[in-house]
Amino acid sequence: MNFVSSILIRWCDVPVYILLRKCVIYKFAYSSRKIESVHCAITDDEVMSYNNEDMVPFSAINLPIRFLIFYNAFRSNTSWNYNESQIGNLTISKQS
């Protein structure tokens, strides 16, 4: 499994949009004003170009910080779950 050390993060004031092609688990550690770290566990680390049609809205997330992650384009009817079991940590997993 490949781990990507850097990701393009753009701040915004709209619900989170995640662009992924093959995502297993994403963990976001955030503070009050900035993203402290982004840990990515993915199966394909090829960075792809993106456009608005590639965006998968994940508006169910209610974070103090709104941001966009531009990464592997992901198009699917797959459902997503999120769990905020730990303070300051968010885990997003793709369900088959």
From Swiss-Prot:
Keywords: Mitochondrion
Record's subcellular location: Mitochondrion
One CC-aspect GO term: mitochondrion
Mitochondrion is among the record's keywords: yes
Primary location group: mitochondrion
Record protein name field: Uncharacterized protein C7D4.08
